[in-house]
Regions:
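Contiguous beta-strand segments within globular domains
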Residues: 58-70, 178-195
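C-terminal motif of bacterial Sec signal peptides marking the signal peptidase cleavage site
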Residues: 14-17
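Acidic/polar, low-complexity intrinsically disordered N-terminal segments immediately downstream
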Residues: 20-96, 102-103, 125-127
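Hydrophobic beta-strand positions in extracellular immunoglobulin-like domains
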Residues: 54, 70-72, 118-120, 136, ...
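Short flexible loop/turn segments that cap and initiate beta-strands
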Residues: 64, 72-103, 192-229
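Aromatic sugar-binding surface patches on proteins
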Residues: 107-119, 128, 230
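Surface-exposed beta-loop interaction hotspot
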Residues: 123-188
Length: 230
């Protein structure tokens, strides 16, 4: 993935305490597996329910960071040692294709949560739709589940595809910032090559040149822009 910088934001919980002459009570924040996440939907089979989450509880065209966990329907417990892969597929009227996606890994410091990303390069419409197939293994037993997922068009364009000078198709997606500000913005983009309709590997050793413009004010640019490198 093409990366300029990573910016990490940490939310620090504070410990509140109160005291009286008789006792002292300390209240600590309750931290759960799903802090900061909202459910998108569930994908189910006869054995498990796969819960999908992100920060706003919805998918959209472009980059989507997704967290998931697997609930056993019999025990109501969440699986802690699953190996998971996924495959999003767009069902068009004349063809099917996938999109760029990451591997799924266990979320650091979490017991039941896994995460990855999917970049939907096109939105659904009245006749064409995305589904998401999740394959996973628990205790050497393989399972699969598939469901249609809702992928509307994004309010702002965050992904596009183009043909390179090598006649190959590429997909480029803006990952960060999610909400650009009038200031210096650290930016992260992903660049992928379409090898076939189902395979979109990360492109290495490319530079992404940027040229921000303000069309409503004489199409001016901005100062001190730096091209993106890996």
């Amino acid at each position: 993935m093409k990366i300029l910088k990573y910016t990490f934001l940490f939310l620090l919980g504070t410990m509140l305490s109160c005291s009286s002459d008789d006792d002292t009570t300390t209240t600590q924040p309750i931290v759960t597996e799903l802090d900061g996440l909202n459910k998108i939907q569930e994908i189910t089979n006869d054995t498990h329910s796969i819960e999908l989450y992100n920060t706003n509880g919805a998918l959209e065209q472009g980059y989507n960071g997704i967290s998931l966990r697997i609930k056993n329907k019999t025990t109501n417990e969440y699986e802690q040692n699953a190996t998971i892969t996924w495959n999003p597929v767009m069902h068009m009227t004349s063809m099917m294709h996938s999109c760029p996606k990451s591997e799924i890994v266990k979320t650091a410091t979490k017991e039941t949560l896994y995460n990855g990303f999917i970049i939907f390069q096109m939105a659904q419409n009245e006749t064409e739709y995305w589904d998401l197939k999740v394959d996973y293994t628990i205790d050497n037993v393989a399972y699969t589940a598939t469901a249609v997922v809702n992928v509307p068009a994004s309010a702002k364009q965050r992904v596009t595809s183009f043909t390179g000078s090598d006649s190959k198709r590429y997909i480029i997606a803006m990952i960060e910032p999610n909400t650009p500000k009038v200031a210096v913005n650290d930016m992260t983009f992903g660049l992928f090559k379409m090898e076939n309709m189902m395979t979109f590997p990360v492109v290495d050793n490319f530079k992404i040149k940027i040229d921000p413009r303000m069309p409503s004010m004489g199409n001016h640019s901005s100062p001190n822009n730096v091209d993106l490198t890996q």
